[in-house]
Amino acid sequence: MTAGTVFQDTRTPLTVWFRAMWWLTSQKNGVSAVALQRVLGWGSYQTAWTCLHKLRRAMIRPGRERLAGVVEVDESYLGGNEQGVLGRHIAGKALVVVAAEEDGRGIGRIRLRHIPDASAARLIPFIEDSIEPGSTVHTDGWYGYLPLRTAAYQHRISNQKGHSERASELLPRVHQVFSLRKRWLLGTHQGAVAGEHLQDYLNEFAFRFNRRKSRSRGKLFYRLVQHAVATEPTTYRQIVDSAIKRK
């Protein structure tokens, strides 16, 4: 019954898994492993931590529908100065690229990816994976985006005009996402997120953000259950080993 799903070979009763999933999705800002351990009465922090990481990995479906229309794209550092970083490099900081659909004056769906650097070799594959060809990609003038001129996208470039104009004014939607993401990581997880596991947390943030207009927390729970039964199983060792490879 559970073979080929997130629940394969689990020693935890499915009823407890469902309680964990409900708690994770019913809380507006999610839940930390420490809080989940306390709520479910688990004796092991590792059990709660592994459960949450398995569920975070299930939140993102391979082959999901890509963003479309006009999409802003930019990068920012977690834990560092997010404005005007010369050369796009800060030693020891985590770099995240964000794509955000324009929805009138608001934000549509988003995608996020933890990347090692802001080169075209990292940025263009993210755009191709995340944004439908034929869409308009709106970026700043960073050279890593220049190959978009020959790709299957319309490329709109906005450059800062002097020091009085902020990057957040040129690309307001992605910078709003930067701010919300940072606040969420600090609020729910007190900023205690290891860089090698950051992508899993970004998956959860995107899952929540893209369903923020849902009137029912039950819908998030239902979607997570759907994803969990359609996701290949992952063991604790696989989670740890994949994190080591990301370092």
Predicted regions mapped to residue ranges:
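Residue-level recognition of single "structural anchor" positions
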Residues: M1-K247
